[in-house]
């Protein structure tokens, strides 16, 4: 099977170089690597990697950049793998991914185990990620776990290419595209199994550089789930839970916020979002005006 890897990146040239170097250590290399960026500034100077990398340019935004990658790959591959530009894969990740799709013909999407997720903390350094992975690979192999899930986690998710040729990420979810992974993979329900497995694993650094403003993200925390619900790709219960959880967290922690989270900004964005909901306005693109 031919495997295509798509990486969308913005404002992190140094990190991208480190990521590509880590990909060189994979037991099984991807057949195509697509790096979707906004400008040459996202690449830095000099050679990127010893790997052959297809560089494409896109308007900014996770969804737009990933869609550009999908258009580029088209019929070139059998599996499309997306990873964030701060996701470090275990050495066997791509090799195991190929075997999953070969041996489970009913699987259309798969997401791997995140050993540590810096998105929920102040972040994880590359050195720390490598230590996590080294420890995992040296430890006795755990029991294999494969379970059906409703959707994939955007930092590492792969799809059977033949099942997504008519799909695209919704570019009305701008910037970081919060919940775009749920929205995209929900379109695959009825086409086959969506699974999560510890056969694939990695570390999500959760790098804070290049993230959007607190106000914009707070707005998206309210509007995006309801917008996706209205499309039929998220239950009202889940959308409501996400909104409630985030508003409570932002309000509770705004007095003594974490250094790496703009709680006041997020809370302000939440309030603007709630006001728009009360007015019957569900436009994720409004975040660009904040």
Feature-to-residue mapping (PLM):
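Non-catalytic, C-terminal membrane-associated alpha-helical segments of glycosyltransferases
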Residues: 215-224, 235-290
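Short beta-strand-to-loop acidic/aromatic patch adjacent to the donor-nucleotide binding site
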Residues: 77-88
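Active-site nucleotide-sugar/metal-binding loop of Leloir-type enzymes
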Residues: 63-79
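A short, conserved alpha-helix in the catalytic core of glycosyltransferases
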Residues: 151-159, 163-167, 174-200
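Active-site donor/metal-binding and catalytic loop motifs
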Residues: 193, 197-215, 224-228
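Short, flexible, basic/aromatic active-site loop/helix in glycosyltransferases
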Residues: 112, 129-149
């Amino acid at each position: 099977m031919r495997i295509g890897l798509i990486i969308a990146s913005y404002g992190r040239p140094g990190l991208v170089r480190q990521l590509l170097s880590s990909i060189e250590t994979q037991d099984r290399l991807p057949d195509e690597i697509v790096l979707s960026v906004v400008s040459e500034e996202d690449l830095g100077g000099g050679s990127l990697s010893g790997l052959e990398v297809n560089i494409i340019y896109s308007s900014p935004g996770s969804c737009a950049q990933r869609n550009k990658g999908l258009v580029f790959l088209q019929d070139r591959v059998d599996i499309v793998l997306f990873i964030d530009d701060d996701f470090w894969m275990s050495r066997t990740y791509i090799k195991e991914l190929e075997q999953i799709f070969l041996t489970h013909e009913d699987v259309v999407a798969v997401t791997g185990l995140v050993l540590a997720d810096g998105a929920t903390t102040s972040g994880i350094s590359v050195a720390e990620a490598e230590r996590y992975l080294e420890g995992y690979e040296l430890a006795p192999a755990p029991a294999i776990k494969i379970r059906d899930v409703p959707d994939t986690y955007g930092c590492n998710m792969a799809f059977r290419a033949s099942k997504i040729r008519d799909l695209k990420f919704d570019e009305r979810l701008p910037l970081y595209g919060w919940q775009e992974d749920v929205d995209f993979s929900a379109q695959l329900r009825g086409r086959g199994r969506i699974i999560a497995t510890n056969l694939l694993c990695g570390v999500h650094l959760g790098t804070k550089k290049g993230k959007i403003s607190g106000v914009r993200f707070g707005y998206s925390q309210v509007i995006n789930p309801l917008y996706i619900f209205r499309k039929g790709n998220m239950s009202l219960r889940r959308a409501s839970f996400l909104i409630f959880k985030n508003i409570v967290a932002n309000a509770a922690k705004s007095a003594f916020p974490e250094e790496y989270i703009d709680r006041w900004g997020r809370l302000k964005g939440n309030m603007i979002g709630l006001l728009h909901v009360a007015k019957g306005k569900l436009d994720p693109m409004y975040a660009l005006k904040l």
